[in-house]
Amino acid sequence: MDINASRALANVYDLPDDFFPKIDDLVRDAKDALEPYWKSDSIKKHVLIATHFVDLIEDFWQTTQGMHEIAESLRAVIPPTTTPVPPGYLIQHEEAEEIPLGDLFKHQEERIVSFQPDYPITARIHAHLKAYAKINEESLDRARRLLWWHYNCLLWGEAQVTNYISRLRTWLSTPEKYRGRDAPTIEAITRPIQVAQGGRKTTTGTRKPRGLEPRRRKVKTTVVYGRRRSKSRERRAPTPQRAGSPLPRSSSSHHRSPSPRK
């Protein structure tokens, strides 16, 4: 990956959240893009990485949805006077990356106890589920951005996606009154290139290389009395002749008759 593509991939994380499709739509679109490569057993870089994220997102998404459903069902058995655990006592995604997976429950339980030692057991389970679901959602957000990048590179080409991210970020960073109303789309960027490639005529045979032979000078021609005469041809000087006079004689026949006086 060149430096421009690497920079564009890093900029994907700064794009607005609503720019990316929802998880269900994203996975469906990615599978449609990957299906031809799966059938041909392609081992391209973008195919392998996108396939990994499709499997990862599907598993994480189903697990996260299950956590939310269980947490919502526990609300009915939590005592109504229970104070919810403040967000500051819940483990965040950045902290979870530094904690071993087996110790995650222990660290979260210690924080709940520090907030309220006699916290109800149902409320504790609810707090654990909400914390884990949020960690999964933040992990899913990073994964879906990477999945979007890799399967769009398969659809449009890495160079086109890199160019599109650059233009989109420029549009987003430009004040509203100085930019166009609509954000650029990757379809609009790639369409002129596709039309130009499709409309190009193909020629058979080998082309003669230019510059190897001197160019021949074209001879200009003019039309004189219905005849075409080359300008490069030497012209004879016109013989002076008065109107109505006979044709001039040649120099050999130009001699005077003897004078009758002699």
From Swiss-Prot:
Residues 183-262 are annotated as: Disordered. The keyword DNA-binding applies. Signal peptide: none annotated. The modification Phosphoserine is found at residues 232, 245. One of its GO terms (cellular component) is host cell cytoplasm. One of its GO terms (biological process) is viral penetration into host nucleus. Homodimerizes, then multimerizes. Keywords: Capsid protein, Cytoplasmic inwards viral transport, DNA-binding, Host cytoplasm, Host-virus interaction, Microtubular inwards viral transport, Phosphoprotein, RNA-binding, T=4 icosahedral capsid protein, Viral penetration into host nucleus, Virion, Virus entry into host cell. Belongs to the avihepadnavirus core antigen family. A motif (Bipartite nuclear localization signal) lies at residues 215-233. Residues 254-260 are annotated as: RNA binding. One of its GO terms (molecular function) is RNA binding. This is Capsid protein. It comes from Duck hepatitis B virus (strain United States/DHBV-16) (DHBV). The keyword Phosphoprotein applies.
